[in-house]
């Protein structure tokens, strides 16, 4: 197992995001997908905390713009666990966030503000990482794959896991 990263270090090229939010992806109809999202959020929070990647241990989701306020109103009318989705007025939102906020919203106590690069480094553990491996072409060779980097290097693997973010459609079209 080896990780190839296009940037100069693990998780440094991923759209330049130095920070990320971990929040639940709930659906209005309170279905299995929402339940899975809630479970995944608890796991993600645990992983981020264990990695030392957590910068803030809750997320305040504001009732703004109006579309988001209407969506969150529907969530507030449902029966979600209090620590997953806690309604707050603007005074409480201000207190929770530590800065003046003009509107209320909901607090996700298991939400996190994280440092993605630190989380990726923790999850990778001792797995070898090859950096500056900006893959520009993938071809099949026998039962394996050959990956060609922009700088001329080639990598041969029997199996790959592709995690290229916005570049995924282009990467998959080469397979």
Regions found by a protein language model. Give the residues of each.
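Flavin (primarily FAD) binding-site architecture
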Residues: 162-175
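Conserved beta-strand termini and adjacent loop/short-helix elements that scaffold enzyme active sites
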Residues: 6, 56, 90, 109, ...
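Rossmann-like dinucleotide-binding core of oxidoreductases
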Residues: 8-10, 21, 62, 168
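Short beta-strand/turn micro-motifs composed of small residues
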Residues: 5, 63, 164
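Dinucleotide-binding Rossmann-like beta1-alpha1 core, especially the glycine-rich loop
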Residues: 19-97
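Glycine-rich nucleotide phosphate-binding loop and flanking beta-alpha elements
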Residues: 68, 137, 167-170
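Glycine-rich FAD pyrophosphate-binding loop
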Residues: 2-16
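Helical element adjacent to the flavin cofactor pocket in flavoenzyme catalytic cores
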Residues: 106-149, 155-159, 163-164
């Amino acid at each position: 197992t080896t990780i190839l990263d296009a940037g100069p270090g693990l998780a440094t090229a991923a759209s330049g995001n130095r920070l990320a939010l971990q929040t639940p992806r709930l659906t209005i109809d309170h279905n299995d997908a929402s339940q899975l999202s809630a479970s995944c959020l608890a796991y993600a929070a645990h992983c981020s905390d264990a990695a030392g990647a957590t910068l803030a241990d809750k997320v305040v989701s504001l009732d703004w713009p109006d579309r988001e306020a209407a969506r969150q109103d529907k969530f507030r009318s449902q029966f979600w666990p209090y620590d997953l989705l806690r309604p707050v007025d603007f005074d409480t939102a201000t207190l929770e966030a530590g800065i003046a906020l003009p509107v209320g919203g909901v607090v996700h106590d298991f939400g996190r503000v994280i440092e993605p690069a630190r989380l990726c480094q923790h999850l990778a553990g001792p797995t070898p990482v090859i950096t500056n491996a900006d893959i520009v072409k993938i071809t099949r060779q026998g039962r394996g794959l050959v990956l060609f980097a922009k700088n001329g290097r080639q990598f041969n693997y029997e199996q790959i896991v592709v995690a290229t973010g916005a570049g995924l459609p282009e990467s998959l079209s080469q397979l």
